[in-house]
Amino acid sequence: MVTLRAEKDEDMELLVLRLTEKVRKIADAAGLGLEIAQTEVFPSTVNDEHLTGLVRSTAREAGSQILDIEEPFRWSEDFGHFGRICPSVLFGIGAGLGHPPLHHPEFDFNDVLLDHSVGLMKTLSEKLTYDSAALRES
């Protein structure tokens, strides 16, 4: 079993093709049978530019600190499926420095984040529902 990850769908397709060719060549040379199956295939998550801008401006208005990550998250994410059917944006709220990450055994959700995060989501929802300019541009 192997886990493959790529930033773009095209890169993943090429990676799977090349790896399959190499493994098949090795199996053939050793006289072995080979069965390849893909499970939990997730499309890449690509943020819509307009929605990303809307999240940024709304977060700034709410007094949030905005930090850009240098590299995309490498975990599997089924959120990419949404982007195939409608504009979407995936962003993190963040718990700040000094907190164990999500899957760490000592992770404990910081409840202080709830009010601010819910308020941010509420404002984003209102803008997308009632602001005709926001709707037109997305």
Where are these regions (language model features)?
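Metal-dependent amide/peptide-bond hydrolase catalytic core
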Residues: 1-138
